[in-house]
Amino acid sequence: MKKVLIVDNSSYMRMFVKKILEKEGAYTILEASGKDDAMDIFMSQNPAIVILDLNMSETTMEGLEVLTDIMKINSNAVVIIISAVRHEEVQEQCIELGAKGYIKKPIDAKVLLKVLEEYK
């Protein structure tokens, strides 16, 4: 089973994504609520896929920092962004930094699973 790290400051959102993935039965789920936890888990557990929220603090798009740090460690990492940010420039920036996908909130389970299917 592939390890998937879900990174979101919202416990509700982590639970929601976790439930979607658990129904598939193909993933071991890891969770982090912020940048430091995310990087510790990424370094120690080496997840196959990271599902990453951009806005994990009120003042910054901390997810961009996490994405950048992950790509410095492993430029082939599969990072899927989930975010309520709809600005095309932000989406383009995430892809340029190495994200493999960008899913807008509210998350549609079918869309998430379709994106993940590409990396099974």
Annotate each language-model stretch with its function:
Residues 61, 86-101:
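Alpha4 helix (beta4-alpha4-beta5 surface) of REC/receiver domains from two-component response regulators
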Residues 31-49:
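Acidic, metal-coordinating helix/loop segments flanking the phosphotransfer/catalytic sites
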Residues 11-30:
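Two-component/phosphorelay signaling modules centered on CheY-like receiver
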Residues 40, 62-75:
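Short amphipathic alpha-helix used as the core "switch/output" element in two-component signaling
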Residues 55-57:
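The short loop immediately C-terminal to the conserved phospho-acceptor aspartate in CheY-like receiver
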Residues 89, 107-116:
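C-terminal output helix
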